[in-house]
Amino acid sequence: MKTASTIMTTKVVTVTPETSVAEIASLLLEHKISAVPVIDDEQRVVGIVSEGDLLGRPPCGSPRGWWLRLFDESAACLEEIATARHLKARDVMTSPAVTVGEETPIDILATLMRRRRVKRVPILLDGRLVGIISRADVLDALARYGQEAASR
């Protein structure tokens, strides 16, 4: 069975604990990703900020995601939106993040993701971020593994 290092994305978009939620929202949209690991100065993962972390905080009872309102100056509740602009990654991140080492077998990773109900997992080497794996990456790897096994 393949390991995390064989399927991980190595060019990971990251933020620091001091990154603003507005900047995080922009990064998610710009890179078409659903989460960013939060790292310290030594590339150690201290948390993760996902779309769910951002969307889970609607101001004024609005059904619209509050972070989308950061881009809409005409929206109601400007005071709350102004407050939201001052939030940082450290204020909204999930911490600690679920992480694994790069030698973790993919089947173990899939089980962990299911049990912990996470959609992506930062991959570490010597405690430092070296990649990230999404559920789609795991499904693709398991499907390819199944096809390879069937063709033997």
Residues covered by each model-derived region:
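Bateman/CBS regulatory modules and CBS-like beta-alpha motifs in cytosolic regions of diverse proteins
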Residues: 1-33, 38-41, 45-46, 68-112, ...
